[in-house]
Amino acid sequence: MLTDPIADMLTRIRNAHLALHKEVSVPRSKIKESIAAILKQEGYIEDVATEEAEIKISLKYFKGKPVISGLKRVSKPGRRVYVGSTDIPKVQNGLGICILSTSSGVLAGTQARDRKVGGELLCEIW
């Protein structure tokens, strides 16, 4: 049993990128589907296909290099990190995104800032 399924998802994406795989499968959950949808919307992955028990993520490359150069889990099961709408960080001086779990659902940092909602800072991607 996994204690942190979101960290497992990010690690699978990181490892697949380093091995130059075209796609990666992760066990399915609603929050992981939301995170994958945000990654697709922001242009970090090619496509997301949801099957019965897993999510297939098609990875994106540019000139043979992974589009995602870094992933970081911020809020962990042992230490949760919450931010207000005015404290949402800019990742890599605006070149990356952060993903938050808010009362309005899972949102990218820019969406949360626009809606003026804070929440749990799940991860940073750049």
UniProtKB/Swiss-Prot annotation:
Q: Does the keyword Ribosomal protein apply?
A: yes
Any one GO MF term held by the record is: structural constituent of ribosome
List the keywords (alphabetical).
Ribonucleoprotein, Ribosomal protein, RNA-binding, rRNA-binding
A GO biological process held by the record: translation
Q: Which GO terms describe its cellular component?
A: ribonucleoprotein complex; ribosome
Query: Looking at the record's lineage, which domain of life comes first?
Result: Bacteria
Extract the InterPro entries matched here: Ribosomal_uS8 (IPR000630), Ribosomal_uS8_CS (IPR047863), Ribosomal_uS8_sf (IPR035987)
Quote the Gene3D superfamilies the UniProt record gives. Answer: 3.30.1370.30, 3.30.1490.10
**Record keywords: Nucleotide-binding included?**
no
Role noted for this protein:
One of the primary rRNA binding proteins, it binds directly to 16S rRNA central domain where it helps coordinate assembly of the platform of the 30S subunit.
- State the family named in the UniProt similarity comment for this chain: Belongs to the universal ribosomal protein uS8 family.
Q: How does it assemble?
A: Part of the 30S ribosomal subunit. Contacts proteins S5 and S12.
Name under which the protein is recorded: Small ribosomal subunit protein uS8
Q: Which organism is it from?
A: Nitratidesulfovibrio vulgaris (strain DSM 19637 / Miyazaki F) (Desulfovibrio vulgaris)
**What is the name of the gene encoding this protein?**
rpsH
